Amino acid sequence: MNRLFTILCMVSLLVLHTSCNDSVMDLESPNVEMKTRAVEQRVQNLIQQARQGDVEAYYSLALCYRDGDGVEKSWLNMICMYATYSQKTGGDIEDVVELFDEGHPFRLLFEIMDSPSFNEEVEAKLERLKQSAPAEAKAIDAAKRAFTMDEATVAMNIFREAEDEGSELAVIFQAIYYDEAKDKTGQEECLTRIAEKYPFFNLLLGESYVMKYGECEDFSYIQKAIDCYYKADAYGMLIPKYANALWGMYDYFGQKGMLEYDEQEVERLKVLAKRTY
């Protein structure tokens, strides 16, 4: 389970109250719309700051994803932003749990996934999770019974059901399944699909294209990889490892005349590639 949580790390919506009174709603709606636009604009500003390497912007975006503030609530996207913040500041990714109060479903999920085995204490936490986040508990229940690839294949149906019911952990389990099964076609389809909601999965998809380039040296795969990295970058999710990879592509293929070398962009990527260790 520790290995699974390591992979996972590498890796309430904004409620607007409106009155039933038509006249009050007419007065409040413009303010609500203005507030919504302001919040969305703030998120876009934070993303642009993150794309320039502003460390605090990563932390602020993590909170936005935690709270659903201007974006759809997502603990997976939250972890991506917090992980980058941690890499930039020398912090510990596991401190992300401190963003939640005791008893919060994410804390339960964290504690379950961080446990080396399913002992009685963990089973009790899983029962509590079933009450507060049943879709996540459903995914864990299926995963803990999948010891072989055949069992994992059966569990995939449950993972898809759990994902439809709102489980984000089920998304991770599906990505891991295709990786362990060495199913490159299934992996590409899976990553392409889930990257629409969780942009950082574009980084893994891009990495898979780089590996394909290594097998056949078809430059179109490098172009696909670059496209994927920039899709993640558009959300401020180009983490140091992949910023460094993209910088390397500009350097290597630029010298060969296969990519246009953009010095200003390379300098930006160098900033993003920096970490404290």
Feature roles, as predicted:
Residues 16-19:
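C-terminal motif of bacterial Sec signal peptides marking the signal peptidase cleavage site
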Residues 21-23:
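Bacterial signal peptide processing site
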Residues 51, 69-73, 116-117, 148-150, ...:
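Short coil/turn and helix-start
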Residues 51-54, 67-69, 88-92, 96, ...:
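Short helix-capping/linker turns of helical repeat alpha-solenoids
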